[in-house]
Design a protein with these regions (language model features):
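Transmembrane alpha-helices and adjacent helix-loop boundaries
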Residues: 1-213
Length: 213
């Protein structure tokens, strides 16, 4: 039983990480589409994101499982990966776009005034501020990603929640479920917070060096 539970916890952890990383990349690309100067690209990005974000994750998984894949027991991990990644990405796009809008135009102009290129301005001025402004919501999205992996059991994925359902002592199963999800969520919060702080410190150091020059 312990091995079964640990195996389920491993599947949940794996799904959470790979889905969240993939969703972040898709979200960044879609956000870039939102910010594009090309009206066609901007419209496509907004329409696509508007459709995906309105589909519940459970419905999306069933869509991939029963219509696209043809068999809900065939490639269940792959189905869960694709469906959950797209759903989380649609939500992250709004988070990233909000972070971009939070950067003051005056700071961008100041960076260009001291001789920074567009790439330097983005990586050393805009990106750190975007990260700093979205970290709290980004952490919440990581926790949400972890929580919705539980719907993957519908298509046959033996994730953490489905393995604890088999425990005869219902109270013990609930406690183990809470402990497992809390562990993954806490670890994710720690990593994301540390990454945000490191980027903020690097940005301040770069600006100080630029001012000295």
């Amino acid at each position: 039983m312990i091995i079964k539970i640990l195996s389920g916890l491993g599947v949940t952890f794996f799904l959470t990480i790979v889905c969240f990383v993939t969703a972040s990349l898709i979200g960044i690309v879609t956000c870039a589409g939102f910010c594009s100067g090309n009206k066609v690209i901007r419209t496509i990005a907004k329409v696509y994101n508007g459709i995906i974000i309105k589909i519940p994750p459970l419905v999306m998984l069933m869509l991939f499982a029963l219509i696209i894949m043809g068999d809900r027991n065939n490639g269940s991990i792959l189905i869960a990966y694709i469906g959950l990644s797209l759903f989380v990405a649609a939500n992250l796009t709004g988070v990233f776009f909000g972070g971009v809008c939070a950067v003051a135009d005056g700071e961008i102009e100041a960076a260009r005034t001291i001789g920074m290129s567009k790439m330097q301005t983005f990586f050393h001025i805009m990106l750190p501020q975007i990260i700093e402004s979205i970290v709290p919501v980004y952490m919440s999205m990581f926790v949400m990603c972890m929580q919705i992996t539980s719907v993957a059991s519908v298509i046959g994925v033996k994730e953490f929640l489905s393995t604890t359902d088999g425990i005869s002592n219902a109270a013990l199963g609930i406690v183990l479920s809470i402990a497992g999800y809390f562990l993954i969520g806490t670890l994710g919060d720690f990593v994301i917070t540390r990454m945000g702080k490191r980027k903020h410190i690097k940005s301040k150091d770069y600006l100080e060096k630029s001012e000295v020059r």
